[in-house]
Amino acid sequence: MRTGRPRCFCKDEALDKAMTVFWRQGYEGASLSDLTKAMGINPPSLYACFGSKEGLFKAVLERYDQRREIFMGQVLAAPTAAEVAQAYLTGVASFVSDTGGRNPPGCLMVQGGLSGSDKDIPQMLARHRAEKEAMLRTRFEQARKSGDLPKASDPAALARYLMVMANGLCVQAAAGATAKDLQEVAAIALSNWPAMVGTGQPKKSRAKEPA
């Protein structure tokens, strides 16, 4: 007796293909036809595995986060707050522009919701970005506690500054900015760091790019 329809596709590969569609077209712009064609499955299989288009997008975000975990771990492990900032912005600039054909330019967290009208999707993406900002804020709080950052520094504002700069890099990459352009912008943004926190210039410390 058959107990259920066997899954005849690789879930991870299907998610990677769906990720590219959402990345290029945004949540709202990605039709079910586009998604199922890219994933190599039919609509019943999509619904059976993910429940809905929104469920698929959530699964894609989880997979994207898995890719980013190594990158964020390396960023946060940098020995000083200045090097954390350096590793984060230069890493983002490299990731969103020099994809080697693996991904579209830009960032799924930004591009995925830019053209969407479904209010739940931008909120979902905002929560994911807030998690990254919280990681940076916590790291800077630790730096202030250890004396690496002055007591008068504002960890929340520093984390927010990096996130705003990173989001701008993502948008510019999607608009066609080159890797050189983005690294120059990152360098200018980082040149403000010493004045913001009262420390020396950040040393060069680049985290490994997320795959």
Residue ranges and their predicted role:
Residues K119-K145, A157, A187, S191:
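Amphipathic alpha-helical packing segments from all-alpha helical-bundle domains
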Residues G91, P105-Q111, S115, S153-Q172, ...:
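Hydrophobic alpha-helical segments that form the core
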Residues R2, E13, K17, V21-G55, ...:
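Helix-turn-helix
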Residues K11-D12, L32, E54, K58, ...:
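Short, structured helix-loop boundary elements
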Residues M1-F9, T199-A211:
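N-terminal intrinsically disordered/low-complexity leader segments
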Residues E62-R68:
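Short, basic, alpha-helical segments at the C-terminal edge of helix-turn-helix-like DNA-binding modules
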Residues A59, G73-P105, P155-L162, K203-K204:
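Hydrophobic alpha-helical connector segments
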Residues F95-T99, Q142, L162-K180, N192-P202:
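Amphipathic C-terminal alpha-helical segment
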